[in-house]
């Protein structure tokens, strides 16, 4: 398969690039793409930048330039579910915006003319969860659930509670997954998001867990994505 992987931040991109074999860098339309292989799959990686617009542009450039069979959004996210622990991974069953409102004729989070949520193909969710069953598994636990996205770095309990008021089933919150999912929906390209939990706002104060994650725990967090790719 040909797999496109999109991350937002340079810290995430630096870790992901180490997973590639035979890598090389290409420059397209002001963006760098790194190509290589993982588990026999052709892989294209891109750092899109933070937020919905950057990630949508990145997804269009990825799809238009490389025509991947699957697009993966990966990176860190806040845990919406208080049962989650830092370094555990949430794989999307569906993505939705937590900051969109288009009137009473739409569900909260729905863009007019688009689905209320953007579902991940179940076969990819099942493959992701199967990593948990590896003999001698040393990867962080993978859970499946709803990922909500918006233009907000959630660093307070109050903001997290306001999101959960609308989306009580949310498991993780980020700034890119749903915009990439919407782009992939329009371009009819399968999509899945892997989000490594860097902090759980309802168990945190002023994002201290987030900063501790990058200082102490980030190394190796993206190995789960590699294990998933090796199953495709």
Feature-to-residue mapping (PLM):
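Alpha-helix C-terminal capping segments
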Residues: 61-65, 83-84, 181-190
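A C-terminal functional module that forms or caps the active site or interfaces directly
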Residues: 152-202, 206
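Proline-aspartate-enriched helix->loop->beta-strand connector
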Residues: 67-72
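His/Asp/Glu-rich mid-to-C-terminal helical/loop segments that flank catalytic regions of hydrolases
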Residues: 201-232
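N-terminal short beta-loop-beta anion/metal-coordinating cradle
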Residues: 1-60, 65-66
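Active-site-proximal beta-strand elements of phosphoester/diester hydrolases
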Residues: 43-48, 146-148, 194
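Mid-sequence, gly/pro-rich, charge-dense loop/helix-turn segments that line enzyme active sites
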Residues: 80-167
